[in-house]
Amino acid sequence: MRRAVLLLATMALVVLAAGGVALAVTKIGTNGPDTLKGTNGADTLIGKGGNDVLFSLAGRDTLLGGGGKDWLLGGNDQRPLGGDKNLVGGSGNDGVLGGEDSDTLTGNSGNDFADGGPGSDKILGGEGNDLLYDGERRGGATDTLIGGDGNDVMGPFNKPAKRDLVKCGGGFDRVLADRADVVAPDCERVAVGPAAAKELDQHIEESGFYDRIFEGLAPFPGG
């Protein structure tokens, strides 16, 4: 419940910051900390260096992090101009949050946190020790989680169960699943059922993502 409240508050801030409908834009940050906000069009936001915050709104947007600890926020797509997102982290320890549609999230290098949100998402950890979460606990669309290199934790658990696909890759990986999930044989440890849900909550809480996301909004007035 706490996570849901924080997510709703974050998306409200994104909408308030956006203003009216605008044409698609391309924004490129600096080597310092930047806050880049999209429009209702198909935008491209590029973070470059620094600890950046990239906000997507409606439209088929592409968000690219750079060096530093970046936040890539998929926004709320439940609008006539909504669209799938392509969110790609950079070389730092990034937080990547999908929107309402079918998004592709990539952590890239670094120890990243990725939360797909609603929709049929594809979530890729890349290098590093990543925490990948499909963002839905009450059924819904089917997601694909791919860990990549590193010691990853992947949480496709849902109730009621739905058929998510999980592949692990290099490293020693942990999958916290429900009974409908399809887990590849390269995954070293797999937990299923209520114990998996409890462990997933613990990993998410310890990551501090839903607390630190508001620290990442510190440079919000820029744009």
Where are these regions (language model features)?
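Positively charged n-region of N-terminal signal peptides that target proteins for export
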Residues: 1-4, 9
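Bacterial N-terminal signal peptides
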Residues: 8-17
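Sec/Tat signal peptide C-region and signal peptidase I cleavage site
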Residues: 20-26
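Glycine-centered beta-turn/loop sites at beta-strand termini
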Residues: 29-32, 38, 47-49, 55-56, ...
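Extracytoplasmic low-complexity repetitive segments enriched in small/polar residues
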Residues: 38-41, 223
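Leucine-rich solenoid repeat scaffolds
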Residues: 156-199
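Composition-driven, intrinsically disordered low-complexity tracts enriched in small residues
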Residues: 199-223
